[in-house]
């Protein structure tokens, strides 16, 4: 009888402790991994005069060292375009399909600041900067190399290229918390500048500056897999 009472008491105590510990973790937990996708609105900078807006779609996998330090592998597919064969003096105009693969580190302000008890700091904690490295493949789908205004003028270049690039990004991640105060859905809004180590992303090899393109990006991420705890409360 005594053993039964002791066993029941220990079991009750263990249950209470487990409940207390569990409740203590509410607001501290986050998932180690995210998967997501985004839509980007592109603008190209290179050897053409007239800018044109195009789109790209991004798929990403994230490893979260913390809620505010993220290692991101991403694949992006889209189109780039620019120029005007008739009105631009050198007649350059192109359209290209591209795909890129990149690794990027993202650091959010919440990793560096104390946002507890401060409304402004709490709002700024999801602001982030990031950079990395990747490779971009482009294939020209249409191009004009001859000038209408200067007959005989021709701009050389390649129709297919693969080049290293560096993405630099700034943005804000809106975290949506579940009933356990865990950030399970994230809305990502950002601006990304992709600096290419080469001059033929547009199919033209004529300038002394490398090509680049910028993006306004909006996307969503979903948490998956293992859940762990952060050193401080995530949501206030």
Model regions: which residues?
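Residues that define the transmembrane beta-barrel architecture of outer-membrane proteins
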Residues: 31, 51-57, 97-101, 125, ...
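Residues on the lipid-exposed face of transmembrane beta-strands in outer-membrane beta-barrel proteins
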Residues: 37-41, 59-63, 103-107, 131-135, ...
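Gram-negative (and chloroplast) outer-membrane scaffold detector with strong preference
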Residues: 69-149
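Structural signature of outer-membrane beta-barrel domains
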Residues: 42-44, 78-82, 110, 134-140, ...
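Predominantly the C-terminal beta-signal and adjacent terminal strand-loop region
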Residues: 98, 174-236
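Short loop/turn motifs that connect adjacent beta-strands in outer-membrane beta-barrel proteins
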Residues: 25-32, 68, 111-125, 176-185, ...
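Extracellular loop and loop/strand-boundary signature of outer-membrane beta-barrel proteins
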Residues: 44-47, 84-98, 117, 152-158, ...
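Short glycine/proline- and aromatic-enriched beta-strand/turn motifs that initiate or cap beta-hairpins
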Residues: 24-64
């Amino acid at each position: 009888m005594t053993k039964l009472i002791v066993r029941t008491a220990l079991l009750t105590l263990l249950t209470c402790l487990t409940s207390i510990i569990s409740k203590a973790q509410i607001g501290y937990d986050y998932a180690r991994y995210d998967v997501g996708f985004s839509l980007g609105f592109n603008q190209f900078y290179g050897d053409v005069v007239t800018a044109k807006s195009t789109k790209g779609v991004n798929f990403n996998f994230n490893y979260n060292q913390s809620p505010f330090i993220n290692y991101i592998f991403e694949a992006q597919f889209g189109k780039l375009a620019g120029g005007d064969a008739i009105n631009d003096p050198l007649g350059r105009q192109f359209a290209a399909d591209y795909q890129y693969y990149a690794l990027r580190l993202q650091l959010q302000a919440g990793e560096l600041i104390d946002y507890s008890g401060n409304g402004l700091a709490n709002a700024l904690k999801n602001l982030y900067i990031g950079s990395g490295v990747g490779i971009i493949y482009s294939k020209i789908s249409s191009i004009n190399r001859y000038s209408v205004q200067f007959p005989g003028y021709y701009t050389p270049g390649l129709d297919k290229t693969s080049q290293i690039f560096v993405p630099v990004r700034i943005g804000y991640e809106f975290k949506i918390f579940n009933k356990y105060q865990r950030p399970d859905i994230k809305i990502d809004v950002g601006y990304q500048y992709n600096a290419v180590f080469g001059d033929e992303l547009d199919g033209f090899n004529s300038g002394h500056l490398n090509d680049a393109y910028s993006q306004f990006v909006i996307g969503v991420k979903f948490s998956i897999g293992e859940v762990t705890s952060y050193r401080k409360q995530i949501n206030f």
